[in-house]
Amino acid sequence: MICPPGENKSMAERKQGGQGNGVGSSVVTEVKPKTQKPSLYRVLILNDDYTPMEFVVYVLERFFNKSREDATRIMLHVHQNGVGVCGVYTYEVAETKVAQVIDSARRHQHPLQCTMEKD
């Protein structure tokens, strides 16, 4: 089979209905690796009897970008229920936020506890 310029044999064979000896008629499909979304983790603040409520609101605004209203709502939930969710993040981000909260609490001499758990 003579191929027109710019076409290879398999292109010419396909134009003729794929009639050929089978050489050069394989189909290449691109295989994309399946990626999974990363696991998410809830960052939790735990209630205690010593950390001022205003400091908890500050932490929620500063490290979790909460509005004053949302921070106050979460702080009251923590106060009434003993624990509250600050946000849901990938592992590394959650780990960093927990460390930031604990570090800030220690610098301000508050016993505030923060932890994370798989969502």
UniProtKB/Swiss-Prot annotation:
Region feature Disordered, mapped onto this chain: 1-29
GO biological process entries: protein catabolic process; proteolysis
Annotated Pfam families: ClpS
Subunit structure: Binds to the N-terminal domain of the chaperone ClpA.
Function noted in UniProt: Involved in the modulation of the specificity of the ClpAP-mediated ATP-dependent protein degradation.
Family: Belongs to the ClpS family.
Protein name (database record): ATP-dependent Clp protease adapter protein ClpS
Source organism per UniProt: Caulobacter vibrioides (strain ATCC 19089 / CIP 103742 / CB 15)
Source species taxonomy: Bacteria, Pseudomonadati, Pseudomonadota, Alphaproteobacteria, Caulobacterales
